Amino acid sequence: MRVVFRCPPELIEVLPRPVPARDGLPEWLRAMPGEARVPELGGEVRTLKHCPPFIDAMRTGFLMPLAADVRVEGGAFRWDWALPATALGRTTRSPLSFHHAEQASGSPLHDPDRLFLKFNNFWTIELEPGWSLLVVHSVNRPDLPFQTLTGLVDADRYGDGLIHFPARWLDPAFAGVLARGTPVAQCIPVRREALELAFEPLAGETAQRFAELKDALASEPGVYRKRFRAGRS
């Protein structure tokens, strides 16, 4: 799957670049234990570190980075970023901007006391024909002080435009620096095709396979990882 990113030539050596999600896993995932003791069981259980679907979701697609350090203090957002001018003109020079909370009126997202941000993106994203881009908050990252909203962009057709990333600011007590490179969105290419839903009874050979797999899952660890997990580059 080829994804083409473009930016003004004056910014090509200035901007942080999108990275494959597999290269942007958080440090806490590496540091977390593989097992944890459960007093009620009197023993240990395997943690999320041993859950391939949890990790593979975090490794899928690519991450879009925050363009510059942003200092947050007392509800104010500040940055010191000398972005060069470009010959293209009419492009924002700020790593983030703001939405009005009223733009979410009537939805469960609306909260007049909660800031709505827009993380500005400086890279166009072009996908191969027939593919759209599912944009989500970085998967399994509740540790971030914001929540990026989900969107779907037909990036095979919109490859010459900039996709920005609206988000809700979740932590009013946060004080510190959102570092350049912080993942502000996870992007997953999806093929644009109609779904065909089929419903069948679990019987005969499928019922036998179901029973065999259920027994295997109950008798040994790592069955999914060893027998069913697909290889990923």
Which residue ranges define each predicted feature?
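Non-catalytic terminal segments and appended small domains
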Residues: 1-162, 168-233
